[in-house]
Amino acid sequence: MENLLLALKLVVALGILNVWIVRRVQPTPFRGQSAQTLREEFTAYGLPDWVFKAVGVVKVALAVALLISIWKPELKLAQPSALALGGIMVVALGMHLKVRDPAIKSLPALVVLAMCLGIVLL
């Protein structure tokens, strides 16, 4: 179980960092509506620019906290970080529903939500 928990933390944290730092301005088939960048995706959902910035800061901070939890488990960061990220994924799923995206566009949020639940429950 320790190996599974480690894998979940790494995949979630590195995935979030990849999306928000490395691929923020690159198109993917999972962006809402016809958005080509993360900023455009938030605009497509009808959200102001400050929400894009705030969500980015929070998600990167939570991903870093998950990574810290690997080396400093005594800080007890894993479960609260995963719970918060899971909540953000629920909101992301709601945004995809709001703009009536095809179900496939919700897949990354659903998978990250499942992995976050795994972290919380393990």
Residues of each region from the PLM?
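Membrane-interface extramembranous regions
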Residues: 1-122
